[in-house]
Amino acid sequence: MRGFGKYLLWVYAGMALTFLMIPIVYTIIFSFNDSRRTNIIWRGFTFDNWTSVCDAQDVCPAFMNSLIVAGVSTVLATAMGTAIAIALVRYRFKFRQATTLLLFLPMATPEVVLGAGLAAQFLQLGVNKGLGTIIIAHTMFCISFVVVTVRARVAVLDPALEEAGRDLYGSPNQVFWRVTFPLLVPGIVAAALLSFALSFDDFIITNFNAGAAVTFPRFVYTAAARGIPAEANVIASAVFFLAIALVLATQIRGAIKRQQLAKAG
Protein backbone atom coordinates (compact mmCIF):
# COMPACT_ATOMS: atom_id res chain seq x y z
CA MET A 1 0.00 0.00 0.00
CA ARG A 2 2.86 2.34 0.84
CA GLY A 3 4.50 1.60 -2.51
CA PHE A 4 1.25 2.33 -4.34
CA GLY A 5 0.92 5.69 -2.57
CA LYS A 6 4.48 6.57 -3.54
CA TYR A 7 3.68 5.63 -7.15
CA LEU A 8 0.60 7.89 -7.13
CA LEU A 9 2.69 10.73 -5.72
CA TRP A 10 5.17 10.42 -8.57
CA VAL A 11 2.34 10.28 -11.12
CA TYR A 12 0.74 13.39 -9.64
CA ALA A 13 4.08 15.24 -9.60
CA GLY A 14 4.70 14.24 -13.21
CA MET A 15 1.26 15.44 -14.29
CA ALA A 16 1.72 18.77 -12.50
CA LEU A 17 5.15 19.26 -14.09
CA THR A 18 3.77 18.36 -17.52
CA PHE A 19 0.92 20.83 -17.09
CA LEU A 20 3.40 23.58 -16.23
CA MET A 21 5.82 22.76 -19.04
CA ILE A 22 3.38 22.34 -21.95
CA PRO A 23 3.02 26.10 -22.70
CA ILE A 24 6.79 26.60 -22.45
CA VAL A 25 7.59 23.63 -24.71
CA TYR A 26 4.94 24.80 -27.19
CA THR A 27 6.47 28.29 -27.28
CA ILE A 28 9.99 26.96 -27.84
CA ILE A 29 8.98 24.49 -30.57
CA PHE A 30 6.89 26.96 -32.52
CA SER A 31 9.61 29.60 -32.36
CA PHE A 32 11.21 27.43 -35.08
CA ASN A 33 8.00 27.06 -37.09
CA ASP A 34 8.18 28.31 -40.69
CA SER A 35 5.21 30.63 -40.25
CA ARG A 36 4.95 34.37 -39.73
CA ARG A 37 2.15 33.93 -37.19
CA THR A 38 1.85 31.66 -34.18
CA ASN A 39 -0.52 28.76 -34.82
CA ILE A 40 -0.83 25.05 -34.09
CA ILE A 41 -0.04 24.02 -37.68
CA TRP A 42 3.56 22.93 -38.20
CA ARG A 43 4.82 24.27 -41.54
CA GLY A 44 8.44 23.23 -41.32
CA PHE A 45 11.61 23.89 -39.36
CA THR A 46 13.46 27.18 -39.79
CA PHE A 47 15.92 29.47 -38.01
CA ASP A 48 14.59 32.53 -39.84
CA ASN A 49 12.52 33.66 -36.86
CA TRP A 50 15.63 33.66 -34.67
CA THR A 51 17.85 35.46 -37.17
CA SER A 52 15.26 38.13 -37.96
CA VAL A 53 13.70 38.57 -34.55
CA CYS A 54 13.27 42.34 -34.90
CA ASP A 55 11.66 42.20 -38.34
CA ALA A 56 8.16 41.95 -36.88
CA GLN A 57 6.72 45.39 -36.26
CA ASP A 58 6.86 46.64 -32.64
CA VAL A 59 8.21 43.38 -31.17
CA CYS A 60 11.69 44.60 -30.22
CA PRO A 61 10.59 48.09 -29.07
CA ALA A 62 8.00 46.47 -26.79
CA PHE A 63 10.62 44.05 -25.48
CA MET A 64 13.07 46.88 -24.79
CA ASN A 65 10.35 48.82 -22.96
CA SER A 66 9.76 45.79 -20.73
CA LEU A 67 13.48 45.48 -20.03
CA ILE A 68 13.74 49.17 -19.13
CA VAL A 69 10.70 49.08 -16.86
CA ALA A 70 11.73 45.84 -15.16
CA GLY A 71 15.34 46.95 -14.74
CA VAL A 72 14.61 50.38 -13.26
CA SER A 73 11.76 49.21 -11.03
CA THR A 74 13.89 46.29 -9.79
CA VAL A 75 16.76 48.60 -8.80
CA LEU A 76 14.41 51.02 -7.03
CA ALA A 77 12.34 48.33 -5.30
CA THR A 78 15.41 46.36 -4.21
CA ALA A 79 17.17 49.41 -2.76
CA MET A 80 14.12 50.67 -0.87
CA GLY A 81 12.85 47.23 0.12
CA THR A 82 16.23 46.17 1.52
CA ALA A 83 16.47 49.30 3.68
CA ILE A 84 12.92 48.79 4.94
CA ALA A 85 13.54 45.11 5.71
CA ILE A 86 16.63 45.92 7.78
CA ALA A 87 14.75 48.65 9.66
CA LEU A 88 11.81 46.35 10.45
CA VAL A 89 14.06 43.62 11.88
CA ARG A 90 16.78 45.62 13.61
CA TYR A 91 14.95 48.65 15.00
CA ARG A 92 11.98 49.22 17.29
CA PHE A 93 9.89 52.26 16.44
CA LYS A 94 6.34 53.51 16.76
CA PHE A 95 3.80 51.98 14.36
CA ARG A 96 6.27 49.24 13.40
CA GLN A 97 3.55 46.59 13.22
CA ALA A 98 1.26 48.90 11.26
CA THR A 99 4.07 49.56 8.79
CA THR A 100 4.59 45.82 8.36
CA LEU A 101 0.89 45.32 7.69
CA LEU A 102 0.83 48.11 5.11
CA LEU A 103 3.80 46.59 3.31
CA PHE A 104 2.05 43.24 3.04
CA LEU A 105 -1.19 44.72 1.70
CA PRO A 106 -0.05 45.03 -1.96
CA MET A 107 0.71 41.30 -1.97
CA ALA A 108 -2.80 40.47 -0.81
CA THR A 109 -4.60 43.04 -2.96
CA PRO A 110 -5.84 41.98 -6.43
CA GLU A 111 -3.79 43.55 -9.20
CA VAL A 112 -6.89 45.02 -10.82
CA VAL A 113 -7.53 47.02 -7.62
CA LEU A 114 -3.93 48.25 -7.45
CA GLY A 115 -3.90 49.12 -11.13
CA ALA A 116 -7.20 50.99 -11.03
CA GLY A 117 -6.24 52.85 -7.85
CA LEU A 118 -2.91 53.99 -9.25
CA ALA A 119 -4.53 55.00 -12.54
CA ALA A 120 -7.03 57.14 -10.63
CA GLN A 121 -4.21 58.78 -8.65
CA PHE A 122 -2.25 59.61 -11.79
CA LEU A 123 -5.40 61.03 -13.35
CA GLN A 124 -6.11 63.21 -10.31
CA LEU A 125 -2.53 64.50 -10.31
CA GLY A 126 -2.59 65.19 -14.03
CA VAL A 127 0.36 62.89 -14.72
CA ASN A 128 0.80 61.76 -18.30
CA LYS A 129 0.90 57.99 -18.46
CA GLY A 130 3.88 56.26 -19.99
CA LEU A 131 6.97 54.30 -19.00
CA GLY A 132 7.43 56.56 -15.96
CA THR A 133 4.03 55.72 -14.49
CA ILE A 134 4.58 52.02 -15.20
CA ILE A 135 7.89 52.14 -13.33
CA ILE A 136 6.25 53.86 -10.35
CA ALA A 137 3.46 51.28 -10.28
CA HIS A 138 5.81 48.31 -10.57
CA THR A 139 8.17 49.67 -7.93
CA MET A 140 5.26 50.05 -5.54
CA PHE A 141 4.09 46.44 -5.68
CA CYS A 142 7.58 44.93 -6.00
CA ILE A 143 8.77 46.56 -2.75
CA SER A 144 6.53 44.23 -0.73
CA PHE A 145 8.13 41.13 -2.25
CA VAL A 146 11.62 42.52 -1.65
CA VAL A 147 10.84 43.28 1.99
CA VAL A 148 9.49 39.77 2.61
CA THR A 149 12.49 38.09 0.96
CA VAL A 150 15.24 40.23 2.48
CA ARG A 151 13.57 40.37 5.89
CA ALA A 152 13.77 36.58 6.14
CA ARG A 153 17.50 36.79 5.45
CA VAL A 154 18.09 39.58 7.96
CA ALA A 155 16.21 37.67 10.66
CA VAL A 156 18.61 34.70 10.53
CA LEU A 157 21.85 36.70 10.58
CA ASP A 158 24.07 36.05 13.59
CA PRO A 159 24.45 39.35 15.52
CA ALA A 160 27.76 38.05 16.87
CA LEU A 161 29.36 38.60 13.47
CA GLU A 162 28.51 42.29 13.52
CA GLU A 163 29.59 42.55 17.15
CA ALA A 164 32.95 41.07 16.15
CA GLY A 165 33.27 43.74 13.48
CA ARG A 166 32.57 46.47 16.02
CA ASP A 167 35.06 44.90 18.45
CA LEU A 168 37.69 45.30 15.74
CA TYR A 169 36.95 49.05 15.77
CA GLY A 170 34.96 49.03 12.58
CA SER A 171 32.75 52.04 12.02
CA PRO A 172 29.01 51.45 11.47
CA ASN A 173 29.51 51.93 7.72
CA GLN A 174 32.43 49.52 7.63
CA VAL A 175 30.54 46.88 9.61
CA PHE A 176 27.56 47.16 7.30
CA TRP A 177 29.42 47.02 3.99
CA ARG A 178 32.06 44.48 5.02
CA VAL A 179 30.04 42.21 7.30
CA THR A 180 26.28 42.69 7.03
CA PHE A 181 25.89 43.42 3.34
CA PRO A 182 27.88 40.40 2.05
CA LEU A 183 25.74 38.15 4.24
CA LEU A 184 22.59 39.74 2.82
CA VAL A 185 23.64 39.40 -0.82
CA PRO A 186 21.92 36.01 -1.44
CA GLY A 187 18.61 37.38 -0.14
CA ILE A 188 19.00 40.64 -2.04
CA VAL A 189 19.79 38.82 -5.29
CA ALA A 190 16.80 36.52 -4.83
CA ALA A 191 14.56 39.53 -4.17
CA ALA A 192 15.91 41.36 -7.23
CA LEU A 193 15.33 38.36 -9.51
CA LEU A 194 11.80 37.95 -8.18
CA SER A 195 11.07 41.66 -8.68
CA PHE A 196 12.43 41.58 -12.22
CA ALA A 197 10.29 38.57 -13.12
CA LEU A 198 7.15 40.10 -11.60
CA SER A 199 7.70 43.40 -13.37
CA PHE A 200 8.70 41.97 -16.73
CA ASP A 201 5.61 39.81 -17.18
CA ASP A 202 3.03 42.06 -15.48
CA PHE A 203 0.04 42.93 -17.64
CA ILE A 204 -2.88 44.05 -15.46
CA ILE A 205 -1.22 46.89 -13.54
CA THR A 206 0.74 47.86 -16.65
CA ASN A 207 -2.38 48.04 -18.79
CA PHE A 208 -4.02 50.48 -16.37
CA ASN A 209 -1.02 52.81 -16.19
CA ALA A 210 0.79 52.55 -19.52
CA GLY A 211 -1.00 55.12 -21.62
CA ALA A 212 0.40 54.79 -25.14
CA ALA A 213 3.52 52.89 -23.99
CA VAL A 214 3.64 49.28 -25.14
CA THR A 215 5.45 46.63 -23.12
CA PHE A 216 6.00 43.05 -24.27
CA PRO A 217 2.99 41.59 -22.39
CA ARG A 218 0.75 44.35 -23.81
CA PHE A 219 2.09 43.67 -27.30
CA VAL A 220 1.34 39.95 -27.03
CA TYR A 221 -2.16 40.65 -25.71
CA THR A 222 -3.08 43.09 -28.49
CA ALA A 223 -1.44 40.93 -31.17
CA ALA A 224 -3.40 37.84 -30.13
CA ALA A 225 -6.48 39.05 -32.03
CA ARG A 226 -4.67 39.12 -35.38
CA GLY A 227 -2.09 36.44 -34.69
CA ILE A 228 1.00 36.66 -32.52
CA PRO A 229 4.18 37.04 -34.61
CA ALA A 230 6.51 34.06 -34.43
CA GLU A 231 9.25 36.45 -33.28
CA ALA A 232 7.34 36.85 -30.01
CA ASN A 233 7.88 33.14 -29.39
CA VAL A 234 11.58 33.65 -30.06
CA ILE A 235 11.85 36.38 -27.43
CA ALA A 236 9.83 34.36 -24.91
CA SER A 237 12.04 31.32 -25.52
CA ALA A 238 15.22 33.39 -25.17
CA VAL A 239 14.03 34.82 -21.85
CA PHE A 240 13.24 31.30 -20.61
CA PHE A 241 16.69 30.02 -21.59
CA LEU A 242 18.29 33.01 -19.87
CA ALA A 243 16.33 32.28 -16.68
CA ILE A 244 17.46 28.64 -16.78
CA ALA A 245 21.07 29.75 -17.28
CA LEU A 246 20.87 32.10 -14.28
CA VAL A 247 19.43 29.36 -12.07
CA LEU A 248 22.11 26.88 -13.16
CA ALA A 249 24.86 29.45 -12.62
CA THR A 250 23.54 30.16 -9.13
CA GLN A 251 23.36 26.44 -8.28
CA ILE A 252 26.88 25.81 -9.61
CA ARG A 253 28.25 28.78 -7.69
CA GLY A 254 26.56 27.54 -4.51
CA ALA A 255 27.92 24.02 -4.99
CA ILE A 256 31.46 25.33 -5.52
CA LYS A 257 31.20 27.51 -2.43
CA ARG A 258 29.96 24.57 -0.33
CA GLN A 259 32.86 22.43 -1.54
CA GLN A 260 35.33 25.17 -0.63
CA LEU A 261 33.81 25.50 2.84
CA ALA A 262 33.90 21.72 3.30
CA LYS A 263 37.58 21.59 2.37
CA ALA A 264 38.37 24.53 4.64
CA GLY A 265 36.52 22.85 7.51
In which residue ranges do the predicted regions lie?
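Membrane-interfacial helix termini and adjacent extracytoplasmic/periplasmic loops
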Residues: 38, 42, 47, 112-142, ...
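Transmembrane-helix boundary motif in ABC transporter permease subunits
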Residues: 1-7, 71-103, 116, 120, ...
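Interhelical loop and adjacent transmembrane-helix boundary motif
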Residues: 2-5, 35, 50-58, 200-253
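Transmembrane alpha-helices
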Residues: 12, 17-24, 139-140, 147-151, ...
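Hydrophobic positions within alpha-helical transmembrane segments of bacterial inner-membrane proteins
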Residues: 22-24, 70-86, 112, 116, ...
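Short membrane-interfacial helix/loop motifs at transmembrane-helix boundaries
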Residues: 22-57, 207-211, 265
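C-terminal transmembrane helix and the adjacent membrane-cytosol boundary/short C-terminal tail
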Residues: 2-12, 22, 95, 151-162, ...
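Short hydrophobic faces within alpha-helices
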Residues: 63, 88, 105, 160-168, ...
